[in-house]
């Protein structure tokens, strides 16, 4: 397989949806970003794409209640899933979000990979582990980003990284763990490389359509 280098700076917003029934057709390739409400998910997407406001960051955790789709090129999408685990959100709404997350991860056929973001100081909370379990159960590879890595000194950062790598072994899945910081750009290259690898497995018919469109210009 040839690894393509995608230009994530060209990423643009497509649609917001409350559940998978309101998403575009289940085709092409999607990589989803998931994490607790204060894990830095929106900041990571903005850093990856070089766009300060592509994914809205909020001072109030839990504001992202919809599935947000962004297109890199035709047939290649990044998906910002609702943040989870915020204590002040009503229980009924929490359950609704969790159902939407589980349904997306288990039923969306074009989902190629899952990026789970966790604060490096508080990794692998119950809901983080649930996301990993759902992904592994359907054979979806996972990248765990330990965010806010700049908050720890180098030694403590490496210790947390090694601890999480050991802790995820029992999940028996295709899981890569990296330290990440939107502020200091730590781990951004590794995220980009992983996305390029996943997206390079895009179905041939989509690649042909894209090539034909460019030839016709």
UniProtKB/Swiss-Prot annotation:
<feature type="binding site">
    <location>
        <begin position="35"/>
        <end position="42"/>
    </location>
    <ligand>
        <name>GTP</name>
    </ligand>
</feature>
<dbReference type="InterPro" id="IPR030393">
    <property type="entry name" value="G_ENGB_dom"/>
</dbReference>
<feature type="binding site">
    <location>
        <begin position="62"/>
        <end position="66"/>
    </location>
    <ligand>
        <name>GTP</name>
    </ligand>
</feature>
<keyword id="KW-0460">Magnesium</keyword>
<feature type="binding site">
    <location>
        <begin position="180"/>
        <end position="182"/>
    </location>
    <ligand>
        <name>GTP</name>
    </ligand>
</feature>
<keyword id="KW-0547">Nucleotide-binding</keyword>
<keyword id="KW-0131">Cell cycle</keyword>
<feature type="binding site">
    <location>
        <begin position="147"/>
        <end position="150"/>
    </location>
    <ligand>
        <name>GTP</name>
    </ligand>
</feature>
<protein>
    <recommendedName>
        <fullName>Probable GTP-binding protein EngB</fullName>
    </recommendedName>
</protein>
<dbReference type="InterPro" id="IPR027417">
    <property type="entry name" value="P-loop_NTPase"/>
</dbReference>
<dbReference type="GO" id="GO:0046872">
    <property type="term" value="F:metal ion binding"/>
</dbReference>
<keyword id="KW-0342">GTP-binding</keyword>
<dbReference type="InterPro" id="IPR019987">
    <property type="entry name" value="GTP-bd_ribosome_bio_YsxC"/>
</dbReference>
<keyword id="KW-0479">Metal-binding</keyword>
<dbReference type="GO" id="GO:0005525">
    <property type="term" value="F:GTP binding"/>
</dbReference>
<feature type="binding site">
    <location>
        <position position="64"/>
    </location>
    <ligand>
        <name>Mg(2+)</name>
    </ligand>
</feature>
<comment type="similarity">
    <text>Belongs to the TRAFAC class TrmE-Era-EngA-EngB-Septin-like GTPase superfamily. EngB GTPase family.</text>
</comment>
<dbReference type="GO" id="GO:0000917">
    <property type="term" value="P:division septum assembly"/>
</dbReference>
<keyword id="KW-0132">Cell division</keyword>
<comment type="function">
    <text>Necessary for normal cell division and for the maintenance of normal septation.</text>
</comment>
<dbReference type="Pfam" id="PF01926">
    <property type="entry name" value="MMR_HSR1"/>
</dbReference>
<dbReference type="GO" id="GO:0005829">
    <property type="term" value="C:cytosol"/>
</dbReference>
<feature type="binding site">
    <location>
        <begin position="80"/>
        <end position="83"/>
    </location>
    <ligand>
        <name>GTP</name>
    </ligand>
</feature>
<feature type="binding site">
    <location>
        <position position="42"/>
    </location>
    <ligand>
        <name>Mg(2+)</name>
    </ligand>
</feature>
<keyword id="KW-0717">Septation</keyword>
<feature type="domain" description="EngB-type G">
    <location>
        <begin position="27"/>
        <end position="201"/>
    </location>
</feature>
<dbReference type="InterPro" id="IPR006073">
    <property type="entry name" value="GTP-bd"/>
</dbReference>
